[in-house]
């Protein structure tokens, strides 16, 4: 199978052409059905930035250490639900809002290991008033014009809090796992009450205003794609290789700038990376430095006897390493994903 680094090398040559078969294959490997074109992208969560900047643990690339769960894909979904109309005034009720997160981007092969809801308030939040939060899972949608029934929802969280300069987080892993099946995703209902009774419209507005103008709610998921997890290989000795002639098979430097392949609009970070490539001859006899396979050694031997009927082995990657990419997907969600086989570390004859 060709490495993703090889696909990028090809894209540099065809960057001015329409979406190619090779680019479609690469996008598919990245979990995308077409090249994203963010319309109204949301902010990049600090947790995803922190994981990206920390880098991959090469000894355990399929563990999200920041969350303490297995995984190699992190997604952040923005809430798509509306503020609910209050059917009748309810004493001390500040906010009633439906929450909906579209998890259709999670593939069937992925194992969802974490679902975490974040509710973030503005930084000028009011400190003194205590509030009470109730979070329900919607089990069945009410028909238009009909009064909402409490039988159609299940209480998940009930807790009191004060507005501080920080977010509220709730573990919704079990619910998020169910939402991998779209028919089971009816969303959530969020209600926030002032703990004390509100007297008068002015006091009601003063107390509830920080709640009614919270910045956003988002859902973060961590999932594991087992097909992208590789067992770490034993480290080779670190002695440096002697200089080789320029025409001999070896690693060559290649920097991939995502702007050169037309991906700068949706790839958040990195802006580019050192992908490298393999190029050169595999002459007879193969030396240990060329890291030839047993098949390649025999092939060069046969080539030395019958050069017209048997070609020389090819110069190809023998060791590849992963990178992390932070980008917007086709639904404007922020995704952090670890990708195998993105950097050529060593070359040999195959």
Swiss-Prot record:
Keywords, ordered alphabetically: Cleavage on pair of basic residues, Cytokine, Developmental protein, Disulfide bond, Glycoprotein, Growth factor, Secreted, Signal
Pfam families per record: TGF_beta, TGFb_propeptide
GO-annotated molecular function: cytokine activity; growth factor activity; morphogen activity; protein homodimerization activity
InterPro entries the record matches: Cystine-knot_cytokine (IPR029034), TGF-b_C (IPR001839), TGF-b_propeptide (IPR001111), TGF-beta-rel (IPR015615), TGFb_CS (IPR017948)
Glycosylation sites: 171, 202
Leader sequence segment: 1-16
GO CC annotations on file: extracellular region; extracellular space
Localization per Swiss-Prot or TrEMBL: Secreted
Alphabetical list of SUPFAM superfamilies matching this protein: Cystine-knot cytokines
Disulphide linkage map: 249-315, 278-347, 282-349
Alphabetical list of SMART domains matching this protein: TGFB
Membrane-spanning residues: none
Family: Belongs to the TGF-beta family.
Subunit structure: Homodimer; disulfide-linked. Also forms heterodimers with other TGF-beta family members including nodal2/nr-2 and bmp4.
Function description: Required for posterior mesoderm formation during embryogenesis. Acts indirectly to suppress head formation by altering mesodermal patterning. Also involved in the establishment of left-right axis asymmetry, acting upstream of nodal/nr-1. Can exert long-range effects in the embryo.
Official protein name in the record: Derriere protein
Species per Swiss-Prot/TrEMBL record: Xenopus tropicalis (Western clawed frog)
Primary gene name: derriere
């Amino acid at each position: 199978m060709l490495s993703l680094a090889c696909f990028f090398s090809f894209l540099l040559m065809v960057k001015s052409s329409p979406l190619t078969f090779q680019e479609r294959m690469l996008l598919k490997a990245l979990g995308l059905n077409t090249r994203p074109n963010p319309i109204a992208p949301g902010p990049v969560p600090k947790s995803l930035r922190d994981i990206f900047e920390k880098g991959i643990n090469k000894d355990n690339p399929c563990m999200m250490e920041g969350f303490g769960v297995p995984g190699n894909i992190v997604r952040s979904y923005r809430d798509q639900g509306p503020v609910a109309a209050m059917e009748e005034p309810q004493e001390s009720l500040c906010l009633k809002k439906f929450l909906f997160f579209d998890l259709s981007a999670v593939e069937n092969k992925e194992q969802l290991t974490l679902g975490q809801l974040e509710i973030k308030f503005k930084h000028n939040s009011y400190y003194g008033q205590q509030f009470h939060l109730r979070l329900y899972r919607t089990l069945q949608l009410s028909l238009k014009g009909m009064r909402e029934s409490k039988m159609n929802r299940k209480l998940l969280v009930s807790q009191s809090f004060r507005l501080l300069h920080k977010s509220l987080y709730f573990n919704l892993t079990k619910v998020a796992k169910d939402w991998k099946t779209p028919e089971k995703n009816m969303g959530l209902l969020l209600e926030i009450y002032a703990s004390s009774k509100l007297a008068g419209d002015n006091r009601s507005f003063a107390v509830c205003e920080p709640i009614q103008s919270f910045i956003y709610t988002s859902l973060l998921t961590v999932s594991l794609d087992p097909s992208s997890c590789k067992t770490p290989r034993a480290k080779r000795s670190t002695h440096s290789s002697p200089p080789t002639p320029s025409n001999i098979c070896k690693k060559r430097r290649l920097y991939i700038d995502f702007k050169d392949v037309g991906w700068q609009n949706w790839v958040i970070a990195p802006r580019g990376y050192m992908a490298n490539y393999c190029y050169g001859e595999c002459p007879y006899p193969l030396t240990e430095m060329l890291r030839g396979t047993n098949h390649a050694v025999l092939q060069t031997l046969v080539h030395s006897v019958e050069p017209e009927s048997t070609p020389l082995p090819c110069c190809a990657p023998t060791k590849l390493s992963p990178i992390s990419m932070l980008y917007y997907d086709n639904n404007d969600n922020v995704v952090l994903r670890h990708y195998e086989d993105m950097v050529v570390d060593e070359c040999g004859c195959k």
